Amino acid sequence: MAIVGLGTDIVEIERIQAHVARAGDKLAKRVLTEAELAIYTAHSQPSRYLAKRFAAKEAAAKALGTGIGRGVSFQHIHIGNNEDGAPTIHFTEGALTRLQQLKATVGHISIADEKSYAIATVIIESQ
């Protein structure tokens, strides 16, 4: 396997909290898939959850080499968790098309947060 994409993003959680306080769920509805939005609304720390998903999707778009808005939407990237709780990444629509153009077969993701920041790194591999 060869690495064909690498992306990292960091988000200030307080900035997300301020946006949510000012605009409600507008950002969450733009960034999160329906499944992620359901988790967000039930989460004990919704702004922290949103910040981590925002960082993860930005990192994924960077790993794809497009960024958000060049055929890849936040909605085309779903961040979930496996049965052990580790984050997983799934691509659909424009993100999946780009993944196929890269001849990539797998994406790896790491997400972390500490007090004020959320950070994510995505590695995309091809065979």
UniProtKB/Swiss-Prot annotation:
Primary localisation category: cytoplasm
Keyword check for Magnesium: yes
Keywords in alphabetical order: Cytoplasm, Fatty acid biosynthesis, Fatty acid metabolism, Lipid biosynthesis, Lipid metabolism, Magnesium, Metal-binding, Transferase
Biological process (GO), any one: fatty acid biosynthetic process
Cofactor: Mg(2+)
Binding-site positions, Mg(2+): 9, 58
Record's subcellular location: Cytoplasm
Gene3D superfamilies in the record: 4'-phosphopantetheinyl transferase domain (3.90.470.20)
Presence of keyword Magnesium: yes
Domain of life per record: Bacteria
InterPro entries: 4-PPantetheinyl_Trfase_dom (IPR008278), 4-PPantetheinyl_Trfase_dom_sf (IPR037143), ACPS (IPR002582), Ppantetheine-prot_Trfase_dom (IPR004568)
Enzyme class: transferase
Cellular component, GO annotation: cytoplasm
EC number: 2.7.8.7
Signal peptide positions (record): none
Catalytic reactions on record: apo-[ACP] + CoA = holo-[ACP] + adenosine 3',5'-bisphosphate + H(+)
GO molecular function term, any single one: holo-[acyl-carrier-protein] synthase activity
Pfam family, one: ACPS
Record family assignment: Belongs to the P-Pant transferase superfamily. AcpS family.
Function: Transfers the 4'-phosphopantetheine moiety from coenzyme A to a Ser of acyl-carrier-protein.
NCBIfam families recorded: acpS, pantethn_trn
Protein name: Holo-[acyl-carrier-protein] synthase
Organism: Shewanella baltica (strain OS185)
Upper taxonomic lineage: Bacteria, Pseudomonadati, Pseudomonadota, Gammaproteobacteria, Alteromonadales
